[in-house]
Amino acid sequence: MAWGHRTTVCLVLLGVSLGLAIIVLAVVLPHHQASCRPDAFTRAAVAADSKICSDIGRVILQQQGSPVDAAIAALICTGVVNPQSMGLGGGVVFTIYNASTGKVEVINARETVPASHDQRLLDQCTNALPLCTGAQWIGVPGELRGYAEAHRRYGRLPWAQLFQPTIALLREGFRVPPILSQFLNTSFLQPCLNSSTLRQLFFNGTETLRSQDPLPWPALANTLETVAKEGAEVLYTGKLGQTLVEDIAWQGSQLTVQDLAAFRPKVVEPLEMALGNYTLYSPPPPAGGAILSFILNVLKGFNFSAETVAGPEGKVNMYHHLVEALKFAVGQRWRLWDPYSHPGIQNISQDLLRETLAQHIRQQIDGRGDHQLSHYNLSGVRGNSMGTSHVSVLGEDGSAVAATSTINTPFGAMVYSPRTGILLNNELLDLCWRHKPGSTVTPPPVPGEQPPSSMVPSILINEVQGSKLVIGGAGGELIISAVTQAIVNKLWLGFSLTDAIAAPILHVNSKGHVEYEPKFNQEVRKGLQDRGQSQSQSQRPVFLNSVQAVFQEGPCVYAASDLRKAGKASGY
């Protein structure tokens, strides 16, 4: 009996011990898993392509502004710090997640075709020099009405408050930032700048301004003050718009005050696609979300992970499949026509998200990369490869904004309005690459049409794990390649957010050739060549891809701005 009693007591004690151990593990493990790295923020973050603009966005959040408020303030700043990329003379696309409703919306304020555009504009596509275009390529700017619509729907602070930091920046002795200086003093841009009206802004006599030179820009400061006080309508139906139109008319622009008054941003549903445990929300055509979704939908079927790419052959295999998916994607870019101007293709972009198409494409991908262009439906028409800016914001309540803005190629049309301080876009150049594969006919522009775009401001949400990735990029046709690889690196390969963005990328051009960023892994590069992947013979002068992202993982918030553009994120 004594032995049995002792056994019972031991079993009871063992059970109690196991129970306590389970309780301890249940309490300790979540805390361990939720521990944040030293570079994490705990509440909110902003990732713009410069530190000063990220900081301005952060301050707006700390003043109880909404993520949309912060994004707008950061974009206004970026139009000054990186005017070669974006500004009031361009267009913007917002993808916005409202944590209180769980709803995602897209605000599309991309530029449009003016009513009195040159009827023979597209005849100039073949000979167009994207870096020396001109007034005939100017689209109706949508930037400010895009801000106004986003602020009307989601703003919290007074409109004028969003402009004050940048007005102060201009009034207090603004100097040329290093990145702007690089663009101003790049050999392939200088001849165009020298012959343009931008001379009066960016030249000191016969020399272009250099880093830290004073950059007086009183006209833009005055414009921002007017817009802050009177609202966006002063540009679209007021005196500022009249001044802008008059300034650029003598440079060949056919933009009218009627074009400005007629512009309306579109509020639309995002494209939505399951990506493992995440849901990807991205902008529909004419933005590039359908192409980004298509690529990731194809790639997810191959189940790449950190383990599968651990060895050299695994890396080569993954990049081979990526290259092949990018080739098929380039062949689908014609689907990005504006569905409002071309209703016949309204549902074509949705086809790109279908699992049946993804499965079909996977079956077309084998171990070789030397198939004919027709295998991928490639047309050989090249898009622009630089320009644009992106801001990602995550607010304290979990709401998020991904916003991409552009004037198209560096310095846009290189047309300057001296009385408003606004640089104009050359967005109509993007109409040149919207003909179908196998056809040499490019449909004539439609007044009010928005040109196709590679912009992909995107938000990926994992409701179960409480994770969120807010991401987008710049770089023209490089955007989708760069954003795809950043997402793959982060979500599938387990990179830190900073490393996911910093990793050298590859890109597939319209001829199916692979272009490698400097410092791309040479072993992988050789492995791809062994599989028949052809390298582009004309290496681009510089890779201008730039990705900004914020990643929320439980209580941890990580933000990264691309060092390629000397960016730095900010948060708290």
From Swiss-Prot:
It is found in: Membrane. Coiled coil: none annotated. InterPro entries: GGT_CS, GGT_lsub_C, GGT_peptidase, GGT_ssub, Ntn_hydrolases_N. GO terms for cellular component: plasma membrane. Residues 1-6 are cytoplasmic. Its EC number is 3.4.19.13, 2.3.2.2, 3.4.19.14. It is a single-pass type II membrane protein. It comes from the Eukaryota. It holds the Pfam family G_glu_transpept. The active site is at 388 (nucleophile). Residues 30-572 are extracellular. Widely expressed, but at low level, except in the airway epithelial cells. Detected in brain, heart, kidney, liver, lung, spleen, testis and trachea. L-glutamate binds at residues 110, 406, 427, 453-454. GO terms for biological process: amino acid metabolic process; fatty acid metabolic process; glutathione biosynthetic process; glutathione catabolic process; inflammatory response; leukotriene D4 biosynthetic process; proteolysis; response to oxidative stress. GO terms for molecular function: glutathione hydrolase activity; leukotriene C4 gamma-glutamyl transferase activity; leukotriene-C(4) hydrolase; peptidyltransferase activity. Glycans are attached at residues 98, 185, 194, 204, 277, 303, 347, 377. Pathway: Lipid metabolism; leukotriene D4 biosynthesis; Sulfur metabolism; glutathione metabolism. Inhibited by serine-borate. Cleaved by autocatalysis into a large and a small subunit. Glycosylated. It catalyses: glutathione + H2O = L-cysteinylglycine + L-glutamate; an S-substituted glutathione + H2O = an S-substituted L-cysteinylglycine + L-glutamate; leukotriene C4 + H2O = leukotriene D4 + L-glutamate; S-[(2E,6E,10E)-geranylgeranyl]-L-glutathione + H2O = S-[(2E,6E,10E)-geranylgeranyl]-L-cysteinylglycine + L-glutamate. Heterodimer composed of the light and heavy chains. The active site is located in the light chain. A previous study reported that GSH and oxidized glutathione (GSSG) are not substrates for murine GGT5. However, this result contrasts with two studies reported that GSH is indeed a substrate for GGT5. This is Glutathione hydrolase 5 proenzyme. It comes from Rattus norvegicus.
